[in-house]
Amino acid sequence: MEVNQLGLIATALFVLVPSVFLIILYVQTESQQKSS
């Protein structure tokens, strides 16, 4: 089975981008709760 490199990159981005976005939101809410 040939691995389509473009498909692999697209899948990695599709998984990583929302994960990073959620982590950033989580860290922001955590820091806001600690400061208040």
From Swiss-Prot:
It is found in: Cellular thylakoid membrane. Keywords: Formylation, Membrane, Photosynthesis, Photosystem II, Reaction center, Thylakoid, Transmembrane, Transmembrane helix. PSII is composed of 1 copy each of membrane proteins PsbA, PsbB, PsbC, PsbD, PsbE, PsbF, PsbH, PsbI, PsbJ, PsbK, PsbL, PsbM, PsbT, PsbX, PsbY, PsbZ, Psb30/Ycf12, peripheral proteins PsbO, CyanoQ (PsbQ), PsbU, PsbV and a large number of cofactors. It forms dimeric complexes. Part of a photosystem II (PSII) assembly intermediate complex PSII-I; crystallized from a strain deleted of psbJ, it forms monomeric PSII before addition of the oxygen evolving complex. PSII-I includes 3 assembly factors not found in mature PSII (Psb27, Psb28 and Psb34). Residues 1-6 are lumenal. GO terms for cellular component: photosystem II; plasma membrane-derived thylakoid membrane. Disruption phenotype: Decreased yields of PSII dimers with increased PSII monomers, slightly slower photoautotrophic growth, about 20% less oxygen evolution. Formed PSII dimers are less stable than wild-type. The keyword Membrane applies. It is a single-pass membrane protein. The chain crosses the membrane at residues 7-28. Residues 29-36 are cytoplasmic. This is Photosystem II reaction center protein M. Pfam families: PsbM. One of the components of the core complex of photosystem II (PSII). PSII is a light-driven water:plastoquinone oxidoreductase that uses light energy to abstract electrons from H(2)O, generating O(2) and a proton gradient subsequently used for ATP formation. It consists of a core antenna complex that captures photons, and an electron transfer chain that converts photonic excitation into a charge separation. This subunit is found at the monomer-monomer interface. It comes from the Bacteria. Belongs to the PsbM family. One of its GO terms (biological process) is photosynthesis, light reaction. PSII binds multiple chlorophylls, carotenoids and specific lipids. HAMAP family: PSII_PsbM.
